[in-house]
UniProtKB/Swiss-Prot annotation:
Natural source organism: Archaeoglobus fulgidus (strain ATCC 49558 / DSM 4304 / JCM 9628 / NBRC 100126 / VC-16)
Lineage: Archaea, Methanobacteriati, Methanobacteriota, Archaeoglobi, Archaeoglobales
Transmembrane segments: 5-27, 32-49, 61-80, 90-108, 120-142
Record's protein name: Uncharacterized protein AF_1584
Keyword annotations from UniProtKB, A to Z: Cell membrane, Membrane, Transmembrane, Transmembrane helix
Subcellular location as annotated: Cell membrane
Membrane topology: Multi-pass membrane protein
Gene Ontology cellular component list: plasma membrane
Amino acid sequence: MVRRGAMVLLTMLILYAAPSFALYGLADFMSFVYVGAIMIVAFGVYIILGRSKKPGFKEMLAVMLISALTAIFLAYFFSGSEVIVPKLKSLGLFAVVAAMLLALARVFRLEAEADFSLRFFLKWILVVAITFTILSVFMLFLRGVV
């Protein structure tokens, strides 16, 4: 479970870092540090919850809540209160992505995979691709392009 969780954490960090770096370059590096720290805290909570039993939906919500509180603390501690609102918007979008990933992972039965195999990895890529396709179409509708 730890190995699979570490691979998922690394995948999520890359998924956050790639578009962030493409859009903002190194100017958004501190945001990447925030999100990396948040994900590490969330991963630690996930592992702690996973030791007692298999983490379910309530445990995932607890991880997201702790992640949100960590984001608020880091934003206030490092940058002052003026960046809390943009960071919360960014965290809200990330929470939507994470919730969609969890829901689609349940649909594709990723929790039933016993080990981090090629089959698991291909299913995970499919889940991520579907999630970002849905979000992209939604963003196009919000901007009035479609």
